[in-house]
Regions:
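Non-heme Fe(II)/2-oxoglutarate
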Residues: 1-107
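Catalytic core of non-heme Fe(II) oxygenases with the double-stranded beta-helix
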Residues: 94-155
Length: 155
């Protein structure tokens, strides 16, 4: 018997991890002080305080997001966003919010609309390793998900 085997290897794209400099972090905190509209009604998370975040003078877009989009394009290309139209579209920053997350609040698995997405953590009130060690010793689990950001990646 001869098997007719065809191999399929889907193309995968990577993601970027960026350490923000002090200017970018200070800009986000400054925007957070001027928080405007509640944003909770547009989100799936179980977080009490979520607000729209306005990027003053497009600082975040110009100095962080756009350079990351350009870097991503040089590294991986942008062919995953091919749109069946004859005009080219330029990326822009849209729908930015800030969550003030407290103990016992969480975000379930969810998706972000748009082509690219990002998250920034500015103040984490605990140490990951302490959380993982504590709960592992209690229930002897193999996985350490307490206080983690889980990334479900498909294409």
């Amino acid at each position: 018997m001869t098997l007719d085997i065809n191999e399929h290897q889907p193309k995968n794209y990577g993601w970027l991890e960026v350490d923000l400099d002090d200017d970018a972090v200070n800009h986000i905190w400054s925007c957070a002080k001027d928080k405007k509209q509640p944003y909770k009604d547009r989100l799936v998370g179980h977080i009490e305080s979520s607000y729209e975040l306005l990027d003053k003078n497009d600082y975040l877009w110009k100095n962080v997001i756009k350079p990351c989009v350009n870097y991503y394009g040089r590294r991986y290309g942008h062919d995953h966003i091919t749109i069946p139209i004859e005009t080219s579209l330029k990326p822009y920053l849209h729908n930015v919010w800030i969550n003030y997350q407290n103990q016992c609040e969480y975000n379930p698995i969810h998706d972000h609309g748009g082509v690219y997405s990002f998250a920034a953590w500015l103040k984490i009130p605990y140490d990951y390793y302490m959380q993982a060690d504590h709960y592992t010793s209690i229930d002897n689990t193999k996985a350490h998900f307490n206080g983690t950001f889980c990334f479900e990646y498909t294409n």
